[in-house]
Regions:
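N-terminal amphipathic/basic-hydrophobic helices that include classical n-h-c signal peptides
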Residues: 1-21
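Hydrophobic transmembrane alpha-helices
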Residues: 16-93
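Short helix-perturbing small/polar motifs within transmembrane alpha-helices
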Residues: 23-37, 43, 49, 57, ...
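Hydrophobic alpha-helical transmembrane segments
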Residues: 45-50, 78-82, 93-98, 125-130, ...
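Alpha-helical membrane-inserting segments
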Residues: 54, 58, 62, 83, ...
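Alpha-helical membrane segments and adjacent membrane-interface helices in multi-pass membrane proteins
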Residues: 62-137
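Membrane-embedded alpha-helical hairpins and interfacial helices in multi-pass inner-membrane proteins
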Residues: 69, 146-219
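Juxtamembrane/interfacial segments around transmembrane helices
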Residues: 96-107, 125-135, 142, 178-181, ...
Length: 219
């Protein structure tokens, strides 16, 4: 039995054709949003993992200063500054926490002059290593809050280095029981090198941000 008006109600309704799916527009939008979030989360994880491996690679570019000091000359500190400046405070912190976990688990990510693993974390250079997450966080935090110029990047790097050496020298003091000896072993040999690292980190980070801004403006 046909009810009057049924034909009018059905007018304009087209059944799905071959190859089409009857998925509503809101559902498609939800799926698209979910997919986009998954891709973004994957990208963020990849950045954090890649940053931890970058620091591990730089840790192997090391010059031993034994028997003068157990603390080696390495570009690892420069890598940590760059991770904080370029990835930002939160991702930089996460990357350095992952780096410490990798090292504590026995992966060869620490500088090769030490024994590796937990032993190296608890050794004379452990204070520097344990400070890395805070160093990366602080560098990123200061750099994020400003014009992201060379001067701000240099300031962020300097403050981060102060935290790094405060942690490192405090840990060395536990071993030496002497502030003078801790400073001799952990600071005196590295002042000039750290100034160069600060300048390099600031130059790279500020230049990178300018390139990012130009790229976004061109889109």
């Amino acid at each position: 039995m046909r009810v009057e008006g049924d034909d009018q109600a059905l007018t304009g309704i087209r059944p799905p054709q071959i190859g089409e799916t009857a998925v509503s527009k809101p559902t498609t939008q939800v799926l698209s949003t979910s997919y986009g979030r998954t891709i973004e989360a994957t990208r963020q994880v990849a950045l954090v993992v890649g940053a931890s491996l970058f620091v591990a690679l730089c840790a192997h570019i090391t010059i031993s200063l034994m028997p003068l000091t157990p603390v080696p000359l390495t570009v690892q500190n420069l890598a940590v500054l760059l991770v904080g400046l370029l990835l930002g405070s939160r991702r930089g912190f996460a990357a350095m926490m992952l780096y410490l976990i990798e090292g504590a688990a026995g992966f060869p990510v620490f500088n090769p002059t030490g024994p590796g693993g937990i032993v190296q974390l608890l050794g004379p250079t452990g204070g520097f290593l344990i400070a890395y997450p805070i160093v990366a966080f602080l560098a990123g935090y200061v750099f994020e809050r400003g014009t992201r110029s060379f001067l701000r990047a240099a300031t962020a790097s300097l403050l981060a280095e102060i935290v790094l050496f405060t942690g490192g020298l405090t840990w060395l003091y536990v071993f030496t029981h002497s502030l003078a000896k801790a400073a001799y072993l952990g600071l005196n040999f590295f002042i000039a090198a750290e100034v160069i690292k600060i300048m390099l980190a600031a130059g790279i980070a500020s230049r990178w941000r300018k390139l990012e801004e130009r790229f976004r403006a061109a889109e």
